[in-house]
């Protein structure tokens, strides 16, 4: 093999796995990270090992094999054994557009997003698993709430000048809201949820018993009416509900009113609260009771008409059953499934509508065959006197109910009926599996989210003081040549300050080889001590400053890898301090 071919070869070490290809292969996708490796000055901008003559990237080696194959074949496939977010992150790192994924793998690639959207749709904490709060001290005592409160104190975000939480409202509003809205937030929230569930069941039971004749005795009533010449006594009989059922319903309404008012007052977003359908149901179910109580003492005709109307609309109380969705995951899953399967339901309705129209018309004309000459409407030997009546028969037949109130009586009508039944079975069976799959997906995701182990409280470190060497940077106290480091986000203003100081000291502005705002590059001249090779381990040397900070962590030489001059100019680093690894994200 000629020397030119050898110079065209390039070795890329990704996560310990060495990959070999040609520079011309990497140039097939200009503007990507691998295409920049083919540039002549790539050695100074990337993690290059001159001894092994290879570039090193601390990324996923399995995904990189598919990405490199994309440069070779021009087709990007998605591995089935890699989680979607990981593959998406790798594509973003290597600078490849996700729309380049082949159609055969697009659904596999999209699965993680569908799962994330499904998990986000559950959103609230009722599906968040949390351990039994046996040691909970009060409502809303959750780990996340304490972490947020601690973070507020640490970051001095409190309204009070002395660092205390900003008043009663700020302290108790989220706790009381979680107490009535999130049954899984604390032990006391569970008690409130059990009480609400009890009153819901009692209210629905009372509503059903009020319609039973045992609890609606017939009573004789007398009414005096004014007539022209005097008064007239009218006697009539009326069914009257037992008083104890009304009292029970009143107690339930008092609880629902208290619960509704507490949720309204302590709701963090009043507009979203009003738009919530469950909250509208709560209000509509409560209002008729108070109107009925307020108008019961009036004897005017208008008041009686309103009372009669309110007694009719008592059925809205049954809508309280939907409040159970706050307490049962399965009901919430069903609701999400119905919303996610809207297109399938519309498709099912369209199929049924077409079938109903076709078979209702066919059965009408099929039953008219053989009609007697003296019976032009064929009403004597068939039930299908017109096409609209056939709509009912077609719906009942296609859904395989078959009430038997209408049926064909001629051989041609029986043939149409058989075809209608078969078409109904096939039509309904097509969209149903999609709906069932949606339910299974939502239910499995809900169960997985509910069974997630409770996250431990995060350690919130004390913020370093101004002037401290650790101010807005991370110094890893690990042994020399360690490859592990913690990260600390660096403010953009501080990066600009470093660039300005570097420009003043070296007489030129630091240039970035990659236009990547998420990975800032500081290209600066180094002192002789700082010019020592960066090392990852005892056997690997790296020359040049850290450029791709996300490809790995770097260990600086014992002489110090951080400019002392910058410490004087920038508030980020107040004094010179030997560091083993500094990582900027």
UniProtKB/Swiss-Prot annotation:
Effect on the protein of changing residue 229 to Q: Reduces extent of N-glycosylation. Abolishes N-glycosylation
Identification of the protein by name: Voltage-gated potassium channel KCNC1
Annotated keywords: Cell membrane, Cell projection, Glycoprotein, Ion channel, Ion transport, Membrane, Metal-binding, Phosphoprotein, Potassium, Potassium channel, Potassium transport, Synapse, Transmembrane, Transmembrane helix, Transport, Voltage-gated channel, Zinc
Main location: membrane
Domain notes from UniProt: The segment S4 is probably the voltage-sensor and is characterized by a series of positively charged amino acids at every third position.
Phosphothreonine sites (modified residues): 483
Self-association state and partner proteins as the record states: Homotetramer. Homomultimer. Heteromultimer with KCNG3, KCNG4 and KCNV2. Heteromultimer with KCNC2. Heterotetramer with KCNC3. Interacts with the ancillary subunits KCNE1 and KCNE2; the interaction modulates channel activity.
Membrane-spanning ranges: 191-209, 248-267, 277-295, 309-331, 345-366, 415-436
GO CC annotation terms, alphabetical: axolemma; axon terminus; calyx of Held; cell surface; dendrite; dendrite membrane; neuron projection membrane; neuronal cell body
A GO BP entry: response to light intensity
GO molecular function terms noted in the UniProt entry: delayed rectifier potassium channel activity; kinesin binding; metal ion binding; transmembrane transporter binding; voltage-gated monoatomic ion channel activity involved in regulation of presynaptic membrane potential; voltage-gated potassium channel activity
Record's function text: Voltage-gated potassium channel that opens in response to the voltage difference across the membrane and through which potassium ions pass in accordance with their electrochemical gradient. The mechanism is time-dependent and inactivation is slow. Plays an important role in the rapid repolarization of fast-firing brain neurons. Can form functional homotetrameric channels and heterotetrameric channels that contain variable proportions of KCNC2, and possibly other family members as well. Contributes to fire sustained trains of very brief action potentials at high frequency in pallidal neurons.
Tissue: Expressed in brain. Expressed in globus pallidal neurons of the basal ganglia (at protein level). Detected on Purkinje cells in the cerebellum molecular layer (at protein level).
